[in-house]
Amino acid sequence: MQPVSVDTVHAPTRELHGGVTIRHPVLVTLVSLELVLLAVQFVLGMFVDLYVTFPSPVFGMYGLMQLMFQPGMGAVMAHMMTGMVLGALTLLTFAAAALSRNTLLIATTGGTFAAVVAAGISGMEFLFSGQNNAYSYGMSLGFLAAFALAFLSLLVAYGRGR
């Protein structure tokens, strides 16, 4: 049995055809999934923005239950649930990056997690503030930051950055 070096444990690599080596294959998979979910989140958010009409923020006797039975709220719920899954995935990716001990990966995945959380908080504030456009803008900035940082994380995990 051969001894396992620290480099093998903390920076696994995978050789592809053509001599391309992936430095962190697990992180490449996780960040790729993040990017796919961010794209789904964008499409759902645009649908909600264009086609869902929100009622007044003053809730009646049944409060939020009445709000959820409005037309188009299924898309809002899908948007919210995708955001929660995305938040959990970015936290998992951040933890995996911390195990890799790569400072740049830790910074980019941590930034992605922070951007997703900021976008989610802005989304909740948007929903409960009477659709204040500042919170909608906050969601869009959070999305842009998360997408850019996730793409940068993918490049670093792939071995293109140091």
Residue positions per predicted region:
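Polytopic transmembrane helical bundles with strong interfacial aromatic enrichment
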Residues: 2-162
